[in-house]
A protein has these predicted regions:
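Polytopic transmembrane helical bundles with strong interfacial aromatic enrichment
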Residues: 1-287
């Protein structure tokens, strides 16, 4: 029973980490859209940019704590309770294992990101924002190494593209919906920004699908092996959710932001489902 609880806790933390990174990529995309001249009046652009910077700082803090929690839970899957909570066990897994070596890279990057994001939120400067965005890109490059993508260059490249494109599409959408629900100054609500986001999201969605197919072909030796496996069932569910996301995105693009948040909220709920399924896939042996 304890093993099942730990397994699901770890999957939940993986989903939280993936989701946080997607939103961080989304803040980069949203801020980039806001930098384009003519997208919104200057006062709104400045206020929205500060709001995005604060969101990046908040998500960075959540990600930092999620990484620490992941270390504790992963250690408990290796060592029995209460030995798994000892300093020696945590150091063994976090500092002396292969998994811990990759985890350390993520922790260092997120710690640096937290410092940069805090500084960018307090005193917005172009140099600080670029440093923060650069760390987010490095974090995106490092994260796939913790899953099935590690050890194969093509698979790693495909999963990195999958994550980056997913962040541009779904992460920016999350920034838009959360910002609107919080009744902050419009982030991606202004007409020009919305339409630019749509034209950014369309190719990003295509990259998500194509990179996912490439990664699958590198992971699975024969597609027929997917049918009777848990991995294949999860992959099918994820494919259906991504297809539904595409339909919602098309509906959003056709209707524009003036029709409210009904469809964007549904799209965001589907995005959460996709992230949860991705975390489950990452923790599931492939055929």
């Amino acid at each position: 029973m304890a093993g099942i609880v730990l397994t699901w806790l770890e999957r939940g933390l993986i989903a939280g980490i993936f989701g946080a990174v997607l939103i961080l990529i989304g803040t980069v995309a949203a801020e980039g859209l806001l930098r384009v001249r003519g997208t919104a009046p200057e006062p709104i652009r400045q206020t929205a940019t500060v709001s995005v910077a604060r969101a990046a700082w908040l998500i960075s803090g959540v990600l930092w704590f999620a990484l620490l929690a992941r270390l504790v839970v992963h250690t408990l899957t290796v060592f029995p309770f209460p030995e798994g909570l000892s300093i020696d066990a945590l150091l063994t897994v976090g500092l002396r294992s292969r998994w811990g070596g990759r985890w350390q890279v993520l922790l260092v990057l997120v710690t640096a990101l937290l410092a940069c994001a805090w500084h960018a939120a307090r005193r917005p400067r172009a140099a600080t924002a670029f440093a923060r965005d650069g760390i987010i890109v490095l974090l995106t490059l490092a994260l796939p190494r913790l899953g099935h993508a590690n050890g194969d260059a093509w698979r790693l490249a495909a999963m990195t593209a999958h994550l980056l494109a997913g962040g541009v599409w779904l992460g920016a959408l999350a920034v838009y919906v959360i910002g609107r629900d919080a009744r902050a100054q419009p982030l991606l609500l202004q007409g020009q920004v919305w339409h630019r986001f749509a034209w950014l999201a369309i190719p990003a969605a295509a990259v998500v699908v194509l990179s996912g197919v490439v990664a699958l072909l590198r992971i699975v030796e024969t597609p027929s092996a997917l049918w009777p496996s848990t991995y294949g069932a999860l992959l099918l569910c994820k494919g259906v959710a991504v297809a539904a996301l595409g339909l919602c995105g098309w509906r959003n693009w056709r209707s524009g932001p003036e029709h409210g948040l009904g469809v964007p909220r549904l799209e965001l709920a589907l995005a959460v489902t996709v992230v949860l399924l991705t975390a489950w896939l990452t923790d599931t042996a492939h055929p």
